[in-house]
Amino acid sequence: ESECPWHPWC
């Protein structure tokens, strides 16, 4: 995903 500031599996 592009929005990855909120999930730690990025």
Curated annotation (Swiss-Prot):
Entry keyword Protein biosynthesis: no
Keyword terms: Amidation, D-amino acid, Disulfide bond, Gamma-carboxyglutamic acid, Ion channel impairing toxin, Neurotoxin, Secreted, Toxin
Similarity remark: Belongs to the O2 superfamily. Contryphan family.
Role according to the record: Its target is unknown, but this toxin may modulate voltage-activated calcium channels (Cav) or calcium-dependent potassium channels (KCa).
Localization in the cell: Secreted
Protein name per its UniProtKB record: Contryphan-Ar4
4-carboxyglutamate found at: E3
UniProt keyword annotation of Disulfide bond present: yes
Domain comment as written in the entry: The cysteine framework is C-C.
Coiled coil stretches, renumbered: none
Cysteine amide modified-residue sites: C10
Any GO molecular function: ion channel regulator activity
Cysteine pairs bridged by disulfides in the record: C4-C10
InterPro entries xrefs: Contryphan_CS (IPR011062)
Cellular component aspect of the GO annotation: extracellular region
Chain positions with D-tryptophan modification: W6
Known tissue expression: Expressed by the venom duct.
Domain of life, source organism: Eukaryota
